[in-house]
Amino acid sequence: MHFTLYSRSYCHLCQDMLDALLLLQPPDKLFTVEVIDIDTSPDTSLLARFDELVPVLFGDLAQPELCHYFLDEAAVRRCLP
């Protein structure tokens, strides 16, 4: 499983969400997390899309977001195999 977390470097909620997400990782089923800083990303559309919503977590970029601001543990667990 792969998660994408849209974030900002100075955002304490972003770090909190990442920390909480990593705590959900089962030892036998590892997942990856790509953290994308919307302020430094070459994709300038991310800033317009996620500016006031960060942190925003996706499990599959083709699907709606899993959560923003705070980790939705139930939504994340539904994504895990």
Positions of predicted regions on the chain:
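Local sequence-structure signature of Cys/Sec-based thiol-disulfide redox active-site neighborhoods
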Residues: 1-24
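Generic recognition of short, well-ordered alpha-helical segments
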Residues: 16-19, 45-49, 71
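Non-catalytic interaction surface on structured domains
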Residues: 18-21, 29-31, 66
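Thiol-based oxidoreductase modules, predominantly thioredoxin-like and allied folds used
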Residues: 30-43
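Structural micro-motif
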Residues: 47-58
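Non-catalytic, surface beta->alpha helical segment in thiol-disulfide oxidoreductase systems
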Residues: 58-81
